[in-house]
C-alpha cells in the first residue's frame, strides 16, 4: 500500500476529528489500557465515540502524529487487503517514534482483519475497532481475538442523550417547570417519531435522512453482504415485521403472510433474512419468559433498533411507536434480560418483563375506557402468581397517576418520564 496515500488518509481524518461536533455520552466509559471493539447500528455514533477518545488523548498530551485513524469505507482504500495491514504499522513508525494509538473504523470490510488485530493486541498496542455487523462477534472471531478486546454495543441516542445534544434542560427541576416541561414534551414527541440517530438532529428533513440510513443498512449491510438475490422478499419481510410490532409472530406465520400476497420465498430463507437483519442491528427480538427454553425462539416479538426506522413503515403509528420506544429503552438498560409474558393457562399477557429489575410493564397510549381493565387486569393476574415484590408500571403517552388496589400498586407513567428514569 502506498505510504503517502495512507498518510494523506490519516491527516484528512485528523482534520475531520478536529472539526467534529461531539456530544458527551457519559454512559460509555473506556479503560485507558484496554482495547475495544465497538459494534452497533450504522450511524449510531460509534465513530463519534472514537473521536472523543482521540480528543481526550490529545488533551492528555498525546501528539496527533501518534493517532492513526483509518476509516475503511474511504474509497481510496477500496483495494486494501489484509497483506496491507503491515503498511499501517510502517507509516505509524514513520510519523512518530512514540507509542501509536490505532483507530480502525468499519474494519470488517477487510477479510482477515481479526488476525491483524490479535497481533496488535499481543504487541500491546492500543487499538479501537468499530463495525456495523454482528459477524464481528462471531464465535470464530471471538476465538481469534481471545479476550484481548472489550466489547461496547453502541446505540443511537437515548432520550437523555437526545435532549443533551439539543441543549434542552431536563433535570428533575425542569420536569416541574411549566415551560421547560412543555419543551421536553415537544421533543419527546419528535423522539417518538424520529428516534435518536445523532446526525438526524442536524436536518429539518429527518425522515429523508433516516430513509437513506435504512437503505444503506438494507442494501449494503444485509442484501449485498449476504448475497441476497430476492431483495423484494426481504423488503416486504421488513415491512411485515414492522406491522407486527406489539405481537409475537412465528417464522411459519411470516411465511404464510408472504405467501398469501404472492411472494415466493422459503421458510428457511425467512429465518436467514431475519438473522441478517439482526446481525446488522436493524431489529432485535424478545422471547416469552414463560416458554420452555427450547421454544423461546419460536414465537418472538420483533422490534426495530430505532423508532425512526420503524416509523418509515407504519400507517397506524401511535401505539406501535410507543411500545417500540419502551422496548429500546429497556434493552439498553437491561441487555439480554427483557422478555414478554404470555400464558394461555393463566390468561396473563404482559408486554415487558425485566426479571433482574423485577419490573413488569404494560404499554398503552391511554388507559381510558376498556384499556384500563385490560392493562391493570393483566398486572393483577401476574401479581397473584409471585411472592416477591415487583414494580408494576403502565407506560402511556402522557397520562400519569397511581392506581392502588388491595392486590397491587401500579404506577402509570408518561413516556417522557419513563425514558428519563435512570
What are these regions (language model features)?
Residues 68-97:
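Short glycine-rich substrate-engagement loop in P-loop NTPases that contacts/grips substrate
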Residues 135-151, 166-167:
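Short regulatory helix/loop adjacent to the ATP-binding pocket of P-loop NTPases
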Amino acid at each position: 500500500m502506498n505510504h503517502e496515500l495512507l498518510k494523506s488518509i490519516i491527516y484528512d481524518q485528523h482534520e475531520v476529528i478536529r472539526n467534529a461536533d461531539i456530544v458527551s455520552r457519559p454512559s460509555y466509559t473506556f479503560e485507558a489500557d484496554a482495547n475495544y471493539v465497538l459494534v452497533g447500528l450504522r450511524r449510531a455514533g460509534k465513530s463519534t465515540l472514537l473521536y472523543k477518545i482521540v480528543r481526550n488523548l490529545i488533551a492528555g498530551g498525546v501528539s496527533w502524529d501518534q493517532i492513526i485513524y483509518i476509516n475503511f469505507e474511504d474509497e481510496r482504500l477500496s483495494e486494501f487487503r489484509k497483506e496491507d495491514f503491515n503498511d499501517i504499522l510502517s507509516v505509524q513508525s514513520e510519523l512518530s517514534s512514540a507509542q501509536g494509538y490505532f483507530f480502525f473504523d468499519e474494519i470488517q470490510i477487510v477479510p482477515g482483519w481479526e488476525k491483524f488485530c490479535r497481533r496488535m493486541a499481543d504487541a500491546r498496542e492500543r487499538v479501537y475497532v468499530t463495525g456495523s455487523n454482528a459477524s464481528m462477534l462471531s464465535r470464530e472471531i471471538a476465538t481469534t481475538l481471545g479476550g484481548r478486546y472489550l466489547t461496547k454495543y453502541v446505540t443511537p441516542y437515548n432520550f437523555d442523550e437526545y435532549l443533551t445534544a439539543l441543549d434542552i434542560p431536563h433535570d428533575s427541576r425542569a420536569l416541574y417547570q411549566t415551560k421547560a416541561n412543555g419543551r421536553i414534551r415537544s421533543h419527546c414527541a419528535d423522539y417518538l417519531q424520529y428516534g435518536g440517530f445523532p446526525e438526524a438532529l442536524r436536518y429539518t428533513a429527518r425522515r429523508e435522512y433516516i430513509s437513506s440510513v435504512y437503505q444503506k443498512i438494507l442494501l449494503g449491510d444485509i442484501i449485498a453482504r449476504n448475497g441476497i438475490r430476492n431483495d423484494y422478499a426481504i423488503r416486504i419481510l421488513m415491512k411485515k415485521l414492522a406491522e407486527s410490532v406489539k405481537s409475537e409472530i412465528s417464522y411459519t406465520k411470516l411465511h404464510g403472510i408472504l405467501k398469501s400476497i404472492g411472494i415466493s420465498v422459503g421458510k428457511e430463507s425467512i429465518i436467514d433474512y431475519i438473522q441478517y437483519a439482526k446481525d446488522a442491528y436493524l431489529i432485535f427480538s424478545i422471547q416469552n419468559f414463560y416458554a420452555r427454553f427450547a421454544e423461546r425462539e419460536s414465537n418472538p416479538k420483533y422490534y426495530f433498533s430505532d423508532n425512526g426506522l420503524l416509523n418509515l413503515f407504519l400507517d397506524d403509528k401511535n401505539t406501535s411507536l410507543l411500545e417500540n420506544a419502551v422496548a429500546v429503552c429497556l434493552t439498553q438498560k437491561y441487555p439480554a434480560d427483557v422478555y414478554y409474558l404470555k400464558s394461555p393457562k393463566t390468561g396473563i399477557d404482559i408486554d415487558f418483563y425485566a426479571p433482574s429489575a423485577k419490573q413488569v410493564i404494560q404499554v398503552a397510549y391511554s388507559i381510558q375506557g376498556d384499556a384500563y381493565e385490560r392493562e391493570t387486569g393483566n398486572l393483577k393476574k401476574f401479581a397473584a402468581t409471585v411472592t416477591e415484590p415487583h414494580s408494576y408500571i403502565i407506560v402511556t403517552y402522557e397520562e400519569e397517576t397511581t392506581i392502588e388496589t388491595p392486590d397491587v400498586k401500579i404506577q402509570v407513567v408518561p413516556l417522557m418520564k419513563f425514558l428519563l428514569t435512570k
